[in-house]
A protein has these predicted regions:
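Short, hydrophobic/aromatic-enriched beta-strand segments in well-ordered soluble domains
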Residues: 483, 533-544, 723
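Aromatic, loop-rich ligand-recognition surfaces of beta-strand-rich domains
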Residues: 700-768, 772-811
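Aromatic (Trp/Tyr) and acidic
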Residues: 24-113, 117, 148-180, 215-232, ...
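Bacterial Sec-dependent N-terminal signal peptides
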Residues: 1-27
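C-terminal beta-rich recognition modules with glycine/proline-rich loops and embedded aromatic residues
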Residues: 237, 299, 365-373, 378-468, ...
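Short, surface-exposed beta-strand/strand-loop-strand elements in extracellular ectodomains
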Residues: 165, 492-500, 505-510, 742-759
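Asp-box/WD-like beta-propeller blade repeats and closely related beta-sheet repeat scaffolds
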Residues: 142-161, 187, 192-212
């Protein structure tokens, strides 16, 4: 194998691809995944998590579907009950689909009669909701006008209706259920719907000419094609890929859905992070089956932009809450990082497909980083609480929830966790790839052999891995063992992050004798005549390492992250003597001791050492610190947390003195987004960020918490302080938000007024100075003193723009 990027086709396989358009090489054989049902885990890290997913996460998610009307919507659509459609989104149907997929994966590994029958009952309701021609989106069938902003007045009217997104998750659930049980009950529903989709969408006369809107149907149709062999499913998936960014039907092109230009012309990852991961996974599926090298060239360019400029050290993607997506290159802010759980899962999907297409370990490196950090941080150790977003810093405002109004992440976790063994192995001809290290037994079928592979390891806490290879018949083949980038001075396969020291050498032995295995594309390749009893031992030294970000990542200046093996660590408040983390710095080279604590957070490695703490008066003192795996934070309640730790006193933040503003409760009156909603739907909500005492650098500084009015353009919006007691005040200072966003810009307001609370009413203050709306500075307002328990800003937003406040001081 040549040591360069290669494309491996699903039917014939490797073709070299790189940005400089080097000639393609003839493939040897395809790289094929090993079904997760053939890999049986028996470790102390993943096995308990997967069992918790089976016994807690899946049942609790189904209960939430029952409680929140997800099943009722299908029953209403199917005429099984009467009632009003429930839920706030046109894609709520996907919640049951995703959980069915996860439950099916669990059934395939460990049969549960009760769960099997429960799935039958749920599928019965879903099938009843399907219209005679195969159509299935309950809010449309139920004619829920409350959600007409999503779907319009008739089928397929709006590109962002999520009808095809619903269909895609239906197909994935149906394929999983069929493979697990052999039952066609849900598969037949999916086929009927897919036949309709193939009839309605396409390049032909009378068909709708547009892409999916929210991608997933692309890779879902490919799954349906692989199960049924029906070519039209592959062709429709290909059509959706090719139609992206063309706007044939006249719809507005948008970065949000990666629909701003044809995929072959794309070179930067933009827009909604989950949509991006799903789209590019689908593109990889289609390109592999249709032998389209041009799409893999595009995917490589886009991936290099993601991994080189937009990937968080936790493997998360998507920096902004606005649009749940990507910001500019190198915008990797920690406190406001979005890193949606679904996006980390999508990142795994995409990287796994890129590995299958190329045989390059760099994709498995990113996959592993996301898997051990960004994905599993999305679910509590108890299995019944979830993060939607996964920031790399918190002041205690983040906490996992049992469910969400937009509940995409819990269902996604249930289906992903059940399939983790799927990412461990792959085959190419008679060769075997080892991508992940988990204690397990696997029965692997190659082109002409059956091989039992048994791993014995304490990974990810211990870097010693023993792999017993037992082929059914003695045979020469290559065992390709991934040597992780973290073991070779490369946290990621780009210059986005680097270690501050050099890695200790790893070692490999076969049957007790050390070998110098050559690496090809990141894999130590062991070619020999394998026979029963052969054992490979790999030792990956797991030293505590410090990680530095590329200088262009502004929010990481003067900070270092802590990594051991594939695990990122963080400081959490309750593990520190003063319960705070931001007033500490840890100089590079500080010794840290790693020890396993079986009784803490279900058993984790803890790092202990001595940090420096900056006091309010500027003094610096030594204090002990403890660091825990990032994925396990917030399992003991809301708390401060940080992944990137200052290495000098200048970058640490002494805990500030409390102020009138910092002690206040911050509120806004949230008007409903839906245009025809009644005024009574307005709610008073907590507004976080404007009184946290983090000093902004500029009006476009979104690295720390701030308040913004989402989807509000040209309106009057309010923000209020509710004080803990009456105060006499005479001055406020407001730092306005102003930055660009593809989904709507944020600008300083056109004007504003300040009100104080007198009894139950609000009165305008008597201003002594001018109301200003300057950028990049505090806008100070003096007024006649008032004694009050509250202040309120009323901001007139500019026409066509939203706005917000970064910080608001009261004197």
């Amino acid at each position: 194998m040549k040591n360069k990027l290669q494309i491996v086709w699903s039917s014939i396989a490797i073709i070299s691809v790189c940005a400089c358009s080097t000639p393609y090489t003839q493939p040897d054989a395809p790289i094929k995944e090993v079904p997760f049902t053939q890999v049986h885990l028996d470790d102390n890290f993943w096995t308990p998590r997967i069992e918790t997913n089976r016994t807690v996460s899946i049942p609790s998610a189904f209960k939430e579907c029952e409680k929140n009307g997800r099943f009722d919507n299908f029953a209403i659509a199917g005429g099984l009950m009467k009632g009003e459609h429930r839920g706030d989104f046109s894609f709520d149907d996907t919640d049951p689909y995703k959980i069915i997929e996860g439950a099916s994966y669990s059934l395939a590994v460990k049969y549960d009669e009760k769960q099997d029958h429960y799935l039958d009952s749920v599928i019965h309701i879903i099938a009843a909701a399907q219209e005679p021609d195969g159509y299935l989106t309950t809010c449309v069938t139920n004619q829920c006008t409350r959600l007409s902003g999503w779907w319009g007045t008739h089928r397929w009217e709006k590109i962002n209706s999520h009808e095809l997104y619903n269909s895609g998750h239906l197909y994935e659930a149906a394929v999983a259920h069929y493979r697990a049980t052999g039952k066609r009950t849900l598969l037949d529903v999916a086929i009927k719907n897919a036949d309709l989709v193939c009839q309605v969408f396409g390049p032909g006369e009378g068909q709708i000419h547009r892409p999916c809107g929210h991608p997933i149907a692309e890779m879902a149709l490919v799954k349906l094609y692989k199960v049924t062999g029906d070519e039209k499913y592959l062709q429709t998936a290909k059509y959706f890929v090719e139609e992206t960014g063309r706007g044939t039907d006249g719809h507005k092109l948008s970065e949000y859905s990666q629909d701003h230009k044809p995929i072959l012309q794309q070179d930067e990852i933009v827009g909604h992070a989950v949509r991006a991961g799903y789209l590019y996974s689908g593109v990889a599926d289609v390109a592999a089956l249709t032998h389209d090298t041009a799409y893999f060239n595009a995917l490589t360019r886009i991936w290099e932009n993601m991994a080189g400029k937009k990937l968080f050290i936790t493997g998360g993607i998507g920096s902004r809450p606005q649009g749940e997506g990507f910001g500019p290159n190198y915008e990797l802010n920690n406190h406001t990082a979005y890193c949606e759980t679904c996006a980390s899962i999508a990142n795994v999907y995409w990287n796994h497909r890129m590995f299958l297409a190329t045989g390059d370990a760099k994709y498995a490196d990113v996959l592993e980083r996301a898997l051990y950090n960004g994905v599993i941080s999305g679910v509590s150790l108890s299995g019944d609480k979830f993060f939607y977003d996964n920031p790399l810093e918190s002041m205690g405002q983040h906490e996992r929830q049992h469910w969400f109004g937009c509940a995409c992440c819990p269902g996604n976790i249930t289906r992903f966790m059940a399939s983790v063994p799927y990412y461990m192995y792959a085959t190419q001809g008679n060769d075997v790839y080892v991508n992940l290290f988990i204690q397990s037994k696997a029965d692997i079928e190659t082109e002409s052999n059956k091989i039992n592979v048994e791993q014995t390891t304490g990974y990810p806490w211990d870097g010693k891995i023993s792999i017993a290879v037992t082929p059914e018949k003695e045979q020469e083949f290559a065992l390709r063992v991934r040597i992780p980038g973290w073991a070779q001075d490369a946290p990621v396969p780009t210059d986005l992050y680097s270690f501050t020291d050099k890695a200790q050498a790893y070692s490999i032995s076969v049957n007790g004798s050390k070998v110098n295995a050559k690496q090809y594309d990141g894999y130590a390749t062991l070619v020999r005549n394998w026979k029963a009893g052969d054992v490979v031992e790999i030792n990956l030294p797991m030293e505590v390492r410090r990680v530095k970000a590329n200088d262009q990542v502004e929010d990481d200046h003067g900070k270092l992250a802590i990594e051991r093996g594939p695990i990122m660590f963080c400081l959490e408040g309750q593990d520190q003597a003063d319960s705070t983390v931001f007033n500490k710095f840890i100089p590079d080279g500080t010794p840290m001791e790693a020890s396993f604590h079986a009784d803490l957070l279900n058993g984790i490695i803890v790092l202990n050492g001595t940090a420096k703490e900056v006091e309010r008066n500027g003094n610096v003192k030594d204090v002990p610190f403890k660091a825990i795996p990032y994925s396990t934070w917030n399992n003991r309640g809301a708390d401060q947390m940080a992944v990137w730790i200052p290495e000098t006193a200048e970058c640490a933040r002494p805990t500030p003195e409390p102020t009138i503003a910092s002690k206040a409760r911050t509120l806004m009156i949230q008007a409903p987004i839906q245009k025809d909603a009644p005024e009574s739907a307005s709610v008073e909500t907590w507004a976080w960020g404007v009184n946290d005492q983090w000093e902004p650098k500029r009006s476009s500084d979104i690295s720390k918490p701030y308040h913004y009015w989402w989807l509000k353009n040209g309106t009057v919006e309010t923000l209020a302080y509710e004080f803990d007691q009456p105060y006499t005040v005479s001055n406020v200072q407001v730092y306005w938000l102003d930055f660009d966003h593809y989904d709507g810009d944020f600008r300083v307001p056109e004007s504003w007024k300040l009100y104080y609370k007198e009894g139950e009413s609000w009165k305008e203050v008597e201003a002594l100075t001018e109301y200003t709306v300057k950028k990049d500075c505090y806008n100070s307002l003096d007024f006649n003193p008032v004694k009050t328990k509250g202040l309120k800003i009323a901001a007139q937003l500019q026409k066509g723009a939203s706005g917000g406040v970064i910080e608001w001081k009261v004197n």
